[in-house]
């Protein structure tokens, strides 16, 4: 992976350090069954997924595969790459005896998350919605399987700290480190807003995060 690109942020020089942190995160997660699959082009056409039990997401979905990031951009849209990547994840889930796929999306379109409308057209169903804009979708292979759910820690979207801005992040996204440590810091300083930054360093911390 040292010589391969990972799609996101590869042309954004200011995110170079964040990009390398994501690569390190990926290498560690491969040992947990994580999969990163992309088109063999210098393009943003890829899917990431792994066992939901090992996902850095506050979701309870035993025996599902969790799609973490799924993106097809630019001229590669409309060419069937998204369906092919999704089908590869479905086939992996079947081969592993999984009950299905699960993912978190914006209830309304968030530019940094999967396209809920497209996923629903591919057979995903909305399982749960949070009041502050996130939805849990599932594509069941086993119709009798229990529904996945958000962990109770995220039900309100609130954290213990009530002053200013509190941000939680991991190295799962190659944009996170730069924009949290630079863009967000700059904005809050300019506006005189208190800022607390919490980097989630373990899977357990991420699974029990308040958002």
Label for each model-derived stretch:
Residues 24-45, 66, 111, 210:
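A short helix-loop-beta-strand connector motif used in the catalytic cores of GNAT acetyltransferases and
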Residues 58-74:
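Conserved acetyl-CoA binding element of GNAT-fold acetyltransferases
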Residues 72, 78-93:
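Conserved acetyl-CoA-binding loop-helix of GNAT-fold acetyltransferases
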Residues 91-111:
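Conserved GNAT acetyl-CoA-binding A-motif
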Residues 104, 120-137:
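Conserved catalytic-core motifs of GNAT/GCN5-like acyltransferases
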Residues 131-155:
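C-terminal "cap" of GNAT-fold acetyltransferases
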Residues 155-189:
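Local sequence-structure signature of Cys/Sec-based thiol-disulfide redox active-site neighborhoods
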Residues 195-211:
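Thioredoxin-like thiol-disulfide oxidoreductase module
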